């Protein structure tokens, strides 16, 4: 069997997404950490915020805790790599650690491309399902209305 026959005999799975949460995350002023071989480094403090479950996850809501940070690298090609680490505290008291690795590209594009892979570490049984799914993120600025970003976490499923 050649590769074309093999690929035709195994139909591709479809990927769907479901909105798990939307977060409004207040951020501090960007700090310049200097140049590195990978690019210009920055640090953006996370000051806090709120998150709200998507339509199918109404019981998933709470606060974004202050104390996290977004480490950024501005590469020589103009693309930004962001690595944010912070905690969210659900209204039931559970603490959920979020690692959000974002790629931002606005070079010659009409709209800014800002998508991520979000790793969730939840200890509770109520939100343990977040540990077992791939979560795709989107990132949008809330400026000038608020010195914040809007992060949405989308659960990726296969059909």
Predicted features along the sequence, with ranges:
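Beta-strand-enriched cores of mature, soluble protein domains
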Residues: 2-159
